Amino acid sequence: MSTEQPQRRTGAGYEADPSEVGRVLLLYSGGLDTSVMLKWIQDHYEAEVVCLTVNLGQPGEDYAVIEDKARRLGAIECHVVDARERFAHEYIARAIRANAIYGNGYPLFTALGRPLIAELAVEQARASGCDTIAHGCTGKGNDQVRIEATIAALAPELKVIAPVRSWQMGR
């Protein structure tokens, strides 16, 4: 009988161990946090990075600039998915019909978008041969829960990296 103790991992079972990471799908906004993450993932995990940017109708975004920036920073692929119609019909319209609001009338549009973004990330990760998905959510809000729970439910084989949470950095 072996006296060797089983290895214990810290964090949730879906969190990536550096030795398990080969190719990462990064949910990429083009902002400072996710741009730093792109390089950090390449350096820390010695991994290839595929970027995914999801257009849910955010105003003022130039998706060609975002894609170009990701490529200049070393992403091996960069995908921009226009999910506005799907988001409007499958999420927003249903929320309006259900009178889904939070607190004093705050619409839940940001929260509603996270499961769709995670679903699209799973699809793209599989299509691009990624074993891990990275996101820029902090450890403070529920966005990380919405994204990670959706990934775990749809693709338990995929691991998750949450650099902002791991770094324990403030903004």
Roles of regions detected by a PLM:
Residues S2-R171:
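ATP-dependent adenylation/nucleotidyltransferase module used to activate substrates
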